[in-house]
Amino acid sequence: MNLKKYEELRKKAESGDANAMLEYSEYLQKYHGLQEAHEWHTKAAKAGNAKAMAEEGNFILYGWVEGSLEEAFVYFRKASELGERKAFSDLGDCFLYGWGCKQNFQKARECYKKASWWKHRKIIKMIDSEKIRKGIDGCKKLDLIRDFYN
């Protein structure tokens, strides 16, 4: 990243742009120090960046930064509510093991299913395009796979 782009990114981050905050923290992590990078990462999460929220939850969960399991759970829940696909899987883990919440297998299953759907929606598109390409309207196996992810 050239100096001009770096300065523009920093100014955007300082003005409150949550996406710029996350991008700036990733830049700092690569080329400067982790402490300042994490400060900007936390700001991005608090400013509503879903990806930063999910990552912040993982930082806490794995002990890379201080925080409680309840805080990690809240980050995962908020990120999943904003549509961050990875957060659904992390939230499922919290429900499965009771990390930061009451253990709930049904909610864990729902989260994993949502995570699976997000992860595999490309597969659904590929299956549909393959059926169109081959002209297979009644292919039971492809229909079963597609239905699993819907």
What are these regions (language model features)?
Residues 14-17, 47-50, 62-63, 81-85, ...:
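Short helix-capping/linker turns of helical repeat alpha-solenoids
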Residues 26, 43-46, 50-81, 86:
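Alpha-helical adaptor scaffolds
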Residues 1, 116-150:
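Terminal, low-structured helical/coil segments at or just beyond the last alpha-helical repeat
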Residues 1-8, 30-40, 65-75, 102-111, ...:
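Structural signature of tandem alpha-helical TPR/SEL1-like repeats
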Residues 6, 10, 17-23, 54-56, ...:
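Alpha-helical tetratricopeptide repeat
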